[in-house]
Amino acid sequence: MAPVAVWAALAVGLELWAAAHALPAQVAFTPYAPEPGSTCRLREYYDQTAQMCCSKCSPGQHAKVFCTKTSDTVCDSCEDSTYTQLWNWVPECLSCGSRCSSDQVETQACTREQNRICTCRPGWYCALSKQEGCRLCAPLRKCRPGFGVARPGTETSDVVCKPCAPGTFSNTTSSTDICRPHQICNVVAIPGNASMDAVCTSTSPTRSMAPGAVHLPQPVSTRSQHTQPTPEPSTAPSTSFLLPMGPSPPAEGSTGDFALPVGLIVGVTALGLLIIGVVNCVIMTQVKKKPLCLQREAKVPHLPADKARGTQGPEQQHLLITAPSSSSSSLESSASALDRRAPTRNQPQAPGVEASGAGEARASTGSSDSSPGGHGTQVNVTCIVNVCSSSDHSSQCSSQASSTMGDTDSSPSESPKDEQVPFSKEECAFRSQLETPETLLGSTEEKPLPLGVPDAGMKPS
């Protein structure tokens, strides 16, 4: 009897264990009413309509039919591009997010159990975020030359730039570069600034000094950390051994620096001297021309009658010099004789008469008792009169009278300088008409002229 009872007890225990561990994956799960003051178990929900505790749907599924008092929830799988990530009792699955844009990268694909996740590409940050991933990306700020990155950008924040401090520089446009320190030089060719590094000159203090072999640390200090210090010490001894030839490059540089101002000064000075020389040559040429003009003007004789008349033509001067050889009394007698002779002659012969009258006035001795016929008394006087006819305009009128004096004391220099001056066609007739006795008398009355030897003897008392 004992073995039978043992087997019966084992069978009952197995049934109880099976009942206690029964799986709730059955399609028709019998809901239950919760006890007062208690809640539904895990992965269950309380339905307000049925007032029963019902089971939830697993991720990737949704509730197709809700539970009742007699039936449990009926679940169904999600469609494509939809998902449910948690235990739920929703009637529809959630839609996956839109595809990633060109500035985004898909880090998680869309499945029935998870949504699609997009993040920003490198160099971009998320300007508008969401629960998972980023909705809108923007490019990171790039710091321009002279500015460095103070705070680098992240997936959700932009870059912060700041100006480079003195002694540092940034010569790039970047969203990651920071300000770097200037290189240290013994001799600075171009000093550095916020956007440019310092430039070191190739001429070192070692070359400028005679005992240059002592300055071995030069290669390390001349270049910054970017240069290679290993080959520099090998070149330093060679530079120190070539010290006698070394000072030539600085001397050439200094000569080139001084050559520009010295050449400029010499060029300006030479140009000034050249201009002064040209001006002096022009002045000397003008000064040499003026005495020649004065000498040419001095050759023309100026008689007292010419000075009284002012500036007259050369023809008028030669016409007026005939008057001083006669006295005032002889001119009066000649004028009276011409007045008596004028009515007897016709008008075309007037120029010839006036010319002859002028010749008589020039050669007359001043006799006051001349005959009515116009024949004057000749006393030791020889008159040569050339009369031009007024009808012949092509001929040149000229008169030349020479008086031969009995007195040998008178020198040829005292006689008037008579020159034969050719006249134009119009002047031959016009001059003869203008030079009437009244004109001759008017010109001679301005200043008394000296009388000749024959005139002095016949001067009326």
Curated annotation (Swiss-Prot):
It comes from the Eukaryota. Phosphorylated; mainly on serine residues and with a very low level on threonine residues. A soluble form (tumor necrosis factor binding protein 2) is produced from the membrane form by proteolytic processing. Residues 23-257 are extracellular. Glycans are attached at T30, N171, N193, T206, S221, T222. Residues 364-377, 404-414 have a biased composition (Polar residues). GO terms for biological process: aortic valve development; cellular response to lipopolysaccharide; extrinsic apoptotic signaling pathway; glial cell-neuron signaling; inflammatory response; intrinsic apoptotic signaling pathway in response to DNA damage; negative regulation of cardiac muscle hypertrophy; negative regulation of extracellular matrix constituent secretion. Residues 227-240, 325-337, 394-403 have a biased composition (Low complexity). This is Tumor necrosis factor receptor superfamily member 1B. It comes from Homo sapiens (Human).
